[in-house]
Amino acid sequence: GFPCGESCVFIPCISAAIGCSCKNKVCYRN
């Protein structure tokens, strides 16, 4: 539920490496 400060409109979340995932075009973690 915390935003990772990254969007995922055109590319995947680079922050997925630290547990972030794409939701509503923004990367979130928990």
Swiss-Prot record:
Disulfide bonds join 4-20, 8-22, 13-27. Pfam families: Cyclotide (PF03784). One of its GO terms (biological process) is defense response. This is a cyclic peptide. The keyword Disulfide bond applies. Signal peptide: none annotated. Belongs to the cyclotide family. Bracelet subfamily. The keyword Disulfide bond applies. InterPro entries: Cyclotide, Cyclotide_bracelet_CS, Cyclotide_sf. Keywords: Disulfide bond, Knottin, Plant defense. The presence of a 'disulfide through disulfide knot' structurally defines this protein as a knottin. This is Cycloviolin-D. There is a cross-link at residues 1-30 (Cyclopeptide (Gly-Asn)). It comes from Leonia cymosa.
